[in-house]
């Protein structure tokens, strides 16, 4: 490099200036990792600032996202569309430089990081996606998918349990193109970490079957660059490069202390730091020669142009594969998807099978996985319960050399055994989705969505198409008892902005839920599915199911020639209960409409006219769902048949009676609501 020290100091200066101007932020990590960044971004990272979305770019993840001024400085200096004014607006409303990096806001940011440990886990997902796409699309002489995934991570990331889940899988999957650089500075918010972090990180990652390099001097760019070059030669293992660094490097009084972590250095300390670094330039001033040393636009454009030539040759030799690759990376569904979705829904409606909705999900998946090669499934050690596997998705396996094991038909596996790692699974799926080329889905019990929750939230924040298959959704799972019976989980998931939640009642609603989830380019989806069998609910019109709620049965459908006096709203397994209660009430000449509401989150986005059509004003509304009642009062319910306590261990049928989920109790609740109205 022309002047590696000045290049690193430019990062340090921008970091401390931006944090000082914002009066908020984390200067220490960017100052400590600046030399590591010079080595990676200056000598190894293959990227194009002119086109941040180049398909074959290396992916870079700043897992310790609080050090966001590192990546903002790098993006600005290397030539991305991130003007200096944006750095001056660090942490300000509507700027491109949020407190933590956000994908879709800042060009060049690959994932939203901040919750520690999830960035390295996203990176595992990205590296997995690269490996699987290379296996699927590369041909002899045509390596169109051939890039690395790099991650910077700190002490907090390796403390978080999710890093164990993800990095163990990375070793098992032999993700040799994943290279992580560990900013080992020994400091966290509470101070020196030695009293509470005694892991031998090197031995830990060796146990994960990683290639471990170091510890090395993280402030020697040449040493770091050499380590990266060595890591790129690895053919079977991911690599961890342990870089010993000093947080707040250059600050005479704050370096190596927690005071460098999460607050401005202060004007006096910044002046002292400038002097110590020999940085004679004012706030936000970068010399032209330093900009020139960092500028990656020409080199990046040349790399992409060279790849484009290779891709053109690939297109000529394999036109169908090339077209499929372009479609997949664009996130477009195939043209025949709409017809497959219609056929799948109609088939379910025609067969009218009585099956658990988890089985209904598998039936829908059989059609969708056959039609969509981008579907990449999995389960957290519950495949036989979640039913996430299909004939088109054999289990993913790797041979001793790290190659994807292919079936007799010559295809690689598309169903991942994540092991008992719900949080890791969820964040890996986020990384797969962020990389592009796949639509990931994964299964576990609904109760264990709590393990995954923050990664689900991150998927919603990042607007990623990730599908969660949550089975055993209620007390209907029976004898396993309250530890496994979901009570608050449906309501809790519905509270996450940007997450679509579906709790379908039968095979048709489940097929619709899957088709909507697959069509949602900018939303994750949670499917809440039953363990127990559910009878088919007869329907006349299928068109309104996708709107989240629809009129399932009117009084005339049970022999009454009068208008509805009340509305029963039900979801999932309770829809049959509502229909049974409707019949009981009809025997007493009480007319009731039954509304199936498989997705409250979808229905809530509908226009007022449709909402009033489904839930007319003036009629008492009674909601029925085996879970907490809080979320139902927003619909103006007169009563809710729900569960505001934990479950019990007993057969499902016994529990239904114990908690009042009988047709008789629902009918009595409706009668009581009508009596109160009088």
Regions found by a protein language model. Give the residues of each.
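Glycine-rich anion-binding loop/nest that anchors nucleotide
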Residues: 154, 444-445, 570, 596
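Conserved acidic/glycine
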Residues: 1-33, 152-153, 157, 161, ...
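Short glycine-rich or small-residue beta-strand-to-loop segments that form or flank ligand, phosphate
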Residues: 60-62, 110-112, 150-154, 213-214, ...
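Thiamine diphosphate
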Residues: 1-149, 297-528, 533-535, 613, ...
């Amino acid at each position: 490099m022309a002047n590696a020290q000045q290049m690193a100091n430019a990062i340090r200066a921008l970091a401390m200036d931006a944090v000082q101007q914002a009066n908020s932020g984390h200067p220490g990590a960017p100052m400590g990792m600046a030399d590591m960044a010079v080595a990676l971004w200056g000598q190894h990272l293959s990227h194009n600032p002119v086109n941040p979305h180049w398909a074959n770019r290396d992916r870079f993840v700043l897992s310790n996202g609080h050090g966001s001024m590192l990546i903002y400085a790098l993006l600005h200096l290397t030539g991305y569309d991130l003007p200096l004014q944006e750095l001056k607006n660090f942490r300000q409303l509507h700027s491109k430089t949020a407190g933590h990096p956000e994908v879709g806001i800042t060009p060049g940011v690959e994932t939203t990081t901040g919750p520690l440990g999830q960035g390295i886990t996203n990176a595992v997902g990205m590296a997995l996606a690269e490996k699987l796409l290379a296996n699927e699309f590369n041909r002899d002489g045509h390596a169109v998918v051939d890039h690395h995934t790099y991650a910077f991570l700190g002490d907090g990331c390796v403390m978080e349990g999710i890093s164990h889940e993800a990095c163990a899988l990375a070793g098992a999957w032999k993700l040799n193109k994943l290279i992580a650089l560990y900013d080992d500075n020994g400091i966290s918010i509470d101070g020196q970490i030695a009293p509470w972090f005694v892991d031998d990180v090197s031995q830990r990652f060796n146990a994960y079957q990683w290639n471990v390099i170091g510890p090395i001097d993280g402030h020697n760019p040449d040493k770091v660059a050499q380590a990266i070059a060595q890591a790129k030669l690895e053919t079977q293992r991911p690599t961890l490069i342990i870089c010993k660094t000093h947080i707040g490097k250059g600050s005479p009084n704050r370096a190596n202390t927690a005071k460098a972590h999460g607050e401005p250095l202060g004007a006096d300390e910044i002046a002292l730091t400038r002097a110590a670094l020999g940085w004679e330039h004012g706030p936000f001033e970068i010399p032209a020669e330093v900009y020139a040393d960092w500028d990656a636009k020409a080199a990046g454009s040349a790399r992409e142009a060279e790849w484009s030539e290779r891709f053109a040759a690939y297109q000529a030799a394999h036109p169908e594969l090339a077209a499929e690759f372009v479609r997949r990376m664009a996130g477009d569904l195939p043209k025949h998807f709409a017809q497959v979705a219609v056929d799948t829904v109609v088939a379910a409606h025609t067969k009218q099978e009585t099956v658990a909705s988890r089985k209904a999900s598998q039936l829908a998946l059989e059609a969708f996985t056959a039609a969509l090669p981008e579907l990449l499934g999995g389960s957290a050690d519950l495949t036989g319960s979640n039913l996430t596997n299909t004939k088109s998705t054999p289990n993913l396996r790797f041979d001793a050399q790290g190659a994807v094991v292919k079936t007799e038909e010559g295809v690689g596996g598309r169903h991942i055994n994540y092991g008992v790692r719900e949080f890791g699974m969820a964040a890996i799926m986020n990384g797969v989705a962020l990389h592009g080329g796949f639509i990931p889905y994964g299964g576990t019990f609904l109760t264990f969505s709590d393990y995954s929750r923050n990664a689900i939230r991150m998927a919603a924040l990042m607007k990623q198409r990730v599908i969660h298959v949550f089975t055993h959704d209620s007390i209907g799972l029976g004898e396993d008892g309250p530890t496994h019976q979901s009570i608050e989980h449906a309501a809790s998931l519905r509270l996450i902005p940007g997450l679509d939640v579906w709790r379908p009642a039968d095979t048709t609603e489940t097929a619709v839920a899957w088709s909507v989830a697959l069509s949602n380019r900018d939303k994750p989806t949670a499917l809440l599915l039953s363990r127990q069998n559910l009878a088919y609910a007869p329907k006349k019109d299928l068109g309104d199911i996708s709107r989240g709620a629809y009129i399932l049965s009117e009084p005339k459908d049970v022999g009454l020639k009068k208008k509805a006096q009340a509305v029963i709203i039900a979801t999932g397994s309770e829809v049959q209960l509502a229909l049974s209660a409707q019949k009981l009430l009809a025997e007493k000449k009480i007319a009731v409409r039954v509304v199936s509401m498989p997705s409250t989150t979808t229905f809530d986005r509908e226009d007022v006219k449709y909402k009033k059509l489904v839930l007319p004003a003036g009629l008492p509304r009674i909601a029925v769902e085996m879970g907490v009642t809080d979320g139902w009062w927003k619909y103006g319910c007169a009563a809710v048949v729900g569960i505001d306590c934990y479950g019990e261990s007993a057969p499902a049928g016994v529990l239904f009676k114990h908690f009042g989920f009988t047709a008789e109790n629902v009918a009595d609740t409706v009668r009581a609501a009508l009596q109160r109205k009088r």
